[in-house]
Amino acid sequence: MSNKHSACQVQFRVIVVGAGIGGLSAAVALANRGHSVLVLESTTKLSHVGAGVALPPTTRKWYESEGVLRAESGCIPLDGIELRKWDTGELVTRTAANPIGKQNAIHHGDMQQALLARAAQLDNISIRLGARVMDIDIDSNTVLLHNGEQVEGDVIIAADGVKSVIKPKICPPGASKAQSTGEAAYRFTLARDLLKDDEELLDLVQRSWATRWDGPSRHVVAYPVRNHQLLNVVLIHPDDGNTEESWTTVADKQDVIEHYQDWNLTLNKLIHLAPTQVPNFRMFLYPPSPVWVKGSTILLGDACHAMLPYLGQGVGQAADDAVAIATVLSTIEHREQLPLALQAYEVSRKSRVEQIQAATYQAREHLHLKDREAQAARDLQRKSASESNQNSDVVKMQHSYWVWDAAKVAQIALTELITG
């Protein structure tokens, strides 16, 4: 094993449940600092499917420092975002990247593959597929697998998503109860070759810009991923209520066409190029987890703070969780300080992500105005803000999240707990 990070002073055996982006991020960060990591993933094959995800500039920088992101990872720094009227497609404003750094776009599968590739370079990470966790004994730090096998560690990280098996063992009953937002998202990607014969559509995938159309009860965003070889398209729309609480169902393309038939021509051209079957994700609001830590078991990522997509904070906040837990576990000098380290992890992360969860939910109201006069006033405000070099409230809020130093905050929390 070789890495440039400071080695931990106490080595822990860490079990990570879940090989999604959050779990793998924590695994790589901990292994880079000398801990022994076992990742347990219930699926028998990691298929690297999905759509585009956003990486804030600080998150991308951290992944690069951990040896995860390379040129071939297909991550695109975006020069900015164009906001257009939903019905005519007329340009409202172009907001260039903030001086802090650029928002980045990457395909979910490419991000996961980059993490797996880095994990394969580290001899203190082991990943077991088809290892479905059925139960956990917090007192003995043991997880029970579907085949009856018991696996013991010093620390257990539950990164097993919104339907976490472990979360009910940590939180009181009802803590995971989801509330429908009344909205869902169609997601699809279009290959560059499909767009090459239409100059307007080709421009969407060639340029390093995101485009967003905000309309009544809906909005759509499109941006390039995979080194400009794919255009990622996400269409938020009212939920018909027929989708169960699950990751996805499949809709007919005709359903998508009907939802946006009154929208601008550019968007409708994109929709007509979509696959005949389009994934449809129902979006739920999950209440803040009252507890993140119990014994030596912690929650991470969607297991404790599932994010709605309106501010593009899902991956960034999961990565900050990974930063925080790697920092505190690698700083303590004695095993007896482990409870304080885990407490510092929760203290440094919980209130922050709760604020972001609330802000994300509120942001959708700004995007989905139904009244045309309200839309016009919003668009005028956006245009004026752009012309005076002042970002809109939503963009300013988003950028404020990018200057956060999760490692520093976790370190401060740990120091305060140790010194009393």
From Swiss-Prot:
SUPFAM superfamilies: FAD-linked reductases, C-terminal domain, FAD/NAD(P)-binding domain. GO terms for biological process: terpenoid biosynthetic process. Gene3D superfamilies: FAD/NAD(P)-binding domain. It is an enzyme of class 1 (oxidoreductase). Its EC number is 1.-.-.-. It comes from the Eukaryota. One of its GO terms (molecular function) is monooxygenase activity. The chain crosses the membrane at residues 12-31. Its cofactor is FAD. Glycans are attached at residues 124, 264. InterPro entries: FAD-bd, FAD-dep_Monooxygenase_BioMet, FAD/NAD-bd_sf. Pathway: Secondary metabolite biosynthesis; terpenoid biosynthesis. This is FAD-dependent monooxygenase ntnJ. Keywords: FAD, Flavoprotein, Glycoprotein, Membrane, Monooxygenase, Oxidoreductase, Transmembrane, Transmembrane helix. GO terms for cellular component: membrane. It is found in: Membrane. The active site is at residue 187. Its main location: membrane. Belongs to the paxM FAD-dependent monooxygenase family. FAD binds at residues 41, 54, 302, 315. FAD-dependent monooxygenase; part of the gene cluster that mediates the biosynthesis of the meroterpenoids nectripenoids A and B, as well as cochliquninone D and isocochliquninone E. The pathway probably begins with the HR-PKS ntnH that catalyzes two chain-extension steps to form a reduced triketide, which then primes the SAT domain in the NR-PKS ntnG to initiate three more cycles of extension to give a linear hexaketide corresponding to the polyketide part of nectripenoids. It is a single-pass membrane protein.
